[in-house]
A protein has these predicted regions:
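Short secondary-structure "cap/edge" segments that initiate or terminate local elements
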Residues: 1-106
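Extended charged/polar low-complexity repeat regions
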Residues: 68, 84-166
């Protein structure tokens, strides 16, 4: 919303959030007309907490797994671009860019705080919490390699499987 665009202090933004909703009619951005809506449908505790969060972006122009312009927290994927880079779709639906690597190489994205590695099993992202996201499956119909697993260094793992269409 407008609070995020203004770059306000996050603590102050939490205080102002309720006011902004009343004044600006959230989830609609009054300046752009963009609709942004998010829901956490369920959470399961554990070594790798499962948090199912849905997000709607009115201007996303994408046919997501939950419908047009809908994104969810496990819709993570990488897509190789012609420019020698990968687009990485984050849990919140944003995309950032990562370089194509040779086997055994690594790259650290300072802005996103992600370590990007190519090993014998495929591409692996490690976040600041130490969670590892594996992308070793086939491309889906949109050209993304979807996350196939999330694991901890202690060996706990969530595994994702997809139908042939992605």
């Amino acid at each position: 919303g407008l609070i995020d665009k203004a770059g306000l202090n996050p603590r102050l933004a939490r205080i102002l959030k309720k006011t902004a909703c009343i004044i600006f009619g959230e989830p609609v951005d009054a300046a752009t007309g963009r609709v942004y809506h998010t829901n956490v449908d369920f959470e399961l505790p554990g070594p790798i907490p499962v948090v199912w969060k849905r997000t709607y972006y009115s201007d996303a122009a994408m046919d997501g797994p939950l419908g047009y312009n809908w994104h969810h927290s496990y819709n993570l994927g990488i897509r190789q671009l012609e420019e020698g880079a990968f687009a990485f779709r984050h849990a919140d639906g944003r995309e950032s860019f990562l370089p194509v690597l040779k086997l055994g190489e690594s790259h650290f994205d300072r802005r996103e705080q992600l370590a990007w590695t190519l090993d014998g099993w495929g591409y692996l992202l490690t976040d600041i919490r130490g969670l590892q996201y594996r992308f070793d499956g086939p491309e889906n119909r949109s050209g993304y390699r979807m996350v196939s697993g999330i694991s901890t260094k202690d060996g706990f793992r969530l595994r994702f499987e997809y139908a042939s269409g992605g």
